Amino acid sequence: IAFAQRHNILIVQDAAYATLIYGRARLSILSRPGGKEAAIELHSMSKSYNMTGWRLGFVAGSARVVSAVAEVKDNVDSGQFKAIQMAACAGIADRKSSEKIRAHYQRRLRGLVKVLKGAGFQAKMPGGTFYLYVPAPKGAAGGLAFANAEDASQYLIKEHCISTVPWDDAGAYL
């Protein structure tokens, strides 16, 4: 925040999964001293409120920055259907609803971590979101070797009907 203030930079925080935090309290950059003036958060209704595909979100920050975003948005599109906006407002107002969704994802992830660990993967519970990436296996029984995550992913889908998303950009992960 101090760096952004010194250099007149606006921090744009991707907070799409802000309600999907596990094992610790959620911390908003806007709650930190100077955060409201130095940052804006981008929120999505998709996963946190089970509104995937509805293409609805909101921004939070200082009145100056939010007004600037609203001005751009007013000139870029015609908004979202009113019923969808009302559904989003109801979701935000009902804190129990987003907590149920968060608990649902947490249960799923804990189960997946347990199963993957049992199968020999180095899986651990993430601190947030609903994704789980694990190091890709280097090979399979019988001496089959995988050069990268893509090879491991193709083997898993073709031989075991297990669908994964390979990620080789920062190491081999599934």
Task: List each language-model region with its residue ranges.
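PLP-dependent class I/II
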Residues: 1-174
